[in-house]
């Protein structure tokens, strides 16, 4: 039997594809996720959905905003999503980096209590807005 290093994890056998990125720390993958999403979506509109989230979620949201991808924040799902939704609604960022996020125009909060139909409509609206925007190429 082959020995396995203690700092490894098995790959999920039901997944068909894996994207391996450089880095040694949690969060190093955040900018790569945004880049891969851009490549996979090609010219189709895409959004990032923030549900709950911890420390790394801030990096994921920042990377999505830098990639000019809208982020739908599900308020009521906990932790980072609730903090970010509260900042969006109050206009009171915690610091300079959150001020950049909340004033970017790419973040949109919706309460989970509004239900599936309202969330689905917001996603459709964000995707329609993206697809009708002029392309960067001209």
Residue ranges of model-derived segments:
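Long, low-complexity, intrinsically disordered segments
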Residues: 134-138
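Acidic/glycine-enriched connector segments
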Residues: 1-120
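Ser/Thr/Pro-rich, acidic low-complexity intrinsically disordered regulatory segments
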Residues: 114, 120-125, 129-133
């Amino acid at each position: 039997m082959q020995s396995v290093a203690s700092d490894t994890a098995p790959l999920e056998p039901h997944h068909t594809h894996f994207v391996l990125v450089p880095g040694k720390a949690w969060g190093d993958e955040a900018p790569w996720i945004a880049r891969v999403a851009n490549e996979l979506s090609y010219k189709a509109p895409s959004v990032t959905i923030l549900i709950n989230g911890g420390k790394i979620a801030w990096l994921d949201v920042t990377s999505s905003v830098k990639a000019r991808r809208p982020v739908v924040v599900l308020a009521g799902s906990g932790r980072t999503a609730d903090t970010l939704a509260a900042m969006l609604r109050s206009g009171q960022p915690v610091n300079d980096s959150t001020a950049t996020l909340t004033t970017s125009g790419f973040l949109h909060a919706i309460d989970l209590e509004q239900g599936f139909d309202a969330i689905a409509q917001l996603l459709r609206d964000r995707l329609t807005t993206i697809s009708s925007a002029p392309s960067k190429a001209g």
